[in-house]
Amino acid sequence: MSSLISFIFLFLFSSITASAQNTFYLYHNCSVTTTFSSNSTYSTNLKTLLSSLSSLNASSYSTGFQTATAGQAPDRVTGLFLCRVDVSSEVCRSCVTFAVNETLTRCPKDKEGVFYYEQCLLRYSNRNIVATLNTDGGMFMQSARNPLSVKQDQFRDLVLTPMNLAAVEAARSFKKWAVRKIDLNASQSLYGMVRCTPDLREQDCLDCLKIGINQVTYDKIGGRILLPSCASRYDNYAFYNESNVGTPQDSSPRPGKGGNSSVIIIAVVVPITVLFLLLVAVFSVRAKNKRTLNEKEPVAEDGNDITTAGSLQFDFKAIEAATNCFLPINKLGQGGFGEVYKGTLSSGLQVAVKRLSKTSGQGEKEFENEVVVVAKLQHRNLVKLLGYCLEGEEKILVYEFVPNKSLDHFLFDSTMKMKLDWTRRYKIIGGIARGILYLHQDSRLTIIHRDLKAGNILLDDDMNPKIADFGMARIFGMDQTEAMTRRVVGTYGYMSPEYAMYGQFSMKSDVYSFGVLVLEIISGMKNSSLYQMDESVGNLVTYTWRLWSNGSPSELVDPSFGDNYQTSEITRCIHIALLCVQEDAEDRPTMSSIVQMLTTSLIALAEPRPPGFFFRSKQEQAGPSIDSSTHCSVDEASITRVTPR
């Protein structure tokens, strides 16, 4: 916010309610950079605009929001007013009229102005302000009273989450308005209110409210923030007219006034409640029996679906609360699937929340696939799925929180890579290998990951690797060894030749990706980059093969290691990696063999041949080998490509 004015404000007028007829002035802001003269066309247009806003018919004020324009460019004036939803049309008209009469006194020569009152907002500008987000020139007002019987850090958490939930509700509503009652304890409650101008898009309203809500310090018993496009407030009394807005969502229902209405409510609600409870009991028993049956039945080759993971389902409101309504500051990263946020469940457990982008056409299938696949996996080198949410348009995965981000964050940063010496990197290579072996052989299902890369390897507190992002994974049947697809997904730099060119994938496809990953871990360089040697240019795999052929594989080693590594150990890892990236899938080792090769040096290694996607020099192109370089891309992003058969 460019010009937020912040100060402590004692609420001396706490007895004023939304139904009060007296208009209570709060604050105004004038644009001192653009002015007009008293006899100008703009001055005439502004007076016309203000007069029209204050002389509408009664029905116009009942909506609580109106816009208007006067004149032609460059002297056109656009204006609007917004009244609180809980005030009557008479109070709205009174407030707007009062504001109009004060406008030219408070901002006599300014082309832009915004005026805040307890019951309404008035705004005008020489720019188009309709359906346009503006968070400049706001004000933060705060009570001088401290919270009672609640620690300040607890108080902030108690208030912030409901206010963010109210912001989401307001952004989705037609009137862009929401209230909340927040119970601090058995005897203390707070009341919250958020609002936007109804012309804003849902996302603009939510962004505006989040900016405002997070400007408040929440260390006092009451506070509010006023912005041109939105406002929010909380206090320890009902400062809005509850009868006009309905009971706040978090509060308990109050008893009705009429005896007949109470009888009708009891007569209708009790039978419905009993019927509902009976249905819940029946479906619970059936669901339990179904889960028991599913545990006993063998897994079909293609019969897995998201319903088998029903016990993992989260409520969307719980996820919103955990992430503070997907607060931008909690964002951990973003990919083709969507955004990932850090969250804290009500139990105190930290989680990573992966939210499917609503514009992602491919993400919906990958979402259901990831739930089905990961829900069945348990291994120390695989990220753990805690649950999911499938509610309306929302598709969310909840994972264990892994604090050290992904491997690429360390490998390809000149400063961060210093935290990964060779001992740690060797440990990471072994952990990744064991994780893939579990997917291929040791789990109940045979799973091909199809998108193994540094960005999908997370590191925990002890730098142990955890394979993540199973959106592209495929489950193989009992005797299935390979599959074909017209929909090639993954990351080109890590794809095996047979998969990238023909859509054929198998366990050996993951082995190829693992080989590329090992070379990146050893060198600290990206396979997608180009490297020059002997007047020839190639990717990391090509560069490694040339070094190997010249008898100088140690030149691949990350200089950040210094002399703190065993040459024989690193050379063996390079050798294993080259075996993994062989052009012919049959020439690549299995993951079980790779784990054994990494575990003991007693196993002899085969001599590697030129790898797949090998960039050949002019001299090499003269040979009989087929040049595969035309099929190689340096794109790092996970892609989906449909190929004709």
Swiss-Prot record:
Source species, domain of life: Eukaryota
Catalytic activity: L-seryl-[protein] + ATP = O-phospho-L-seryl-[protein] + ADP + H(+); L-threonyl-[protein] + ATP = O-phospho-L-threonyl-[protein] + ADP + H(+)
Biased composition (Polar residues): 620-632
GO biological process, one term: response to salicylic acid
Keywords: ATP-binding, Glycoprotein, Kinase, Membrane, Nucleotide-binding, Phosphoprotein, Receptor, Repeat, Serine/threonine-protein kinase, Signal, Transferase, Transmembrane, Transmembrane helix
UniProt main location, coarse: membrane
Catalytic residue list: D451 (proton acceptor)
Modified residues (Phosphotyrosine): Y399, Y499
EC number(s) given by UniProt: 2.7.11.-
Residue ranges of domain Gnk2-homologous in the record: 24-129, 135-239
PROSITE patterns membership: GNK2 (PS51473), PROTEIN_KINASE_ATP (PS00107), PROTEIN_KINASE_DOM (PS50011), PROTEIN_KINASE_ST (PS00108)
Intracellular or extracellular location(s): Membrane
Induction: By salicylic acid (SA) or by a bacterial pathogen infection.
Transmembrane segments: 263-283
Glycan attachment positions: N29, N39, N57, N101, N185, N241, N260
Cytoplasmic side: 284-645
Pfam families: PK_Tyr_Ser-Thr, Stress-antifung
GO molecular function: ATP binding; protein serine kinase activity; protein serine/threonine kinase activity
Signal peptide boundaries: 1-20
Domain Protein kinase: 326-603
Record's keyword annotation contains Transferase: yes
All ranges on the Extracellular side of the membrane: 21-262
Assembly with partners or alone: Interacts with MWL1.
Name listed for the protein in its UniProt record: Cysteine-rich receptor-like protein kinase 19
Native source species: Arabidopsis thaliana
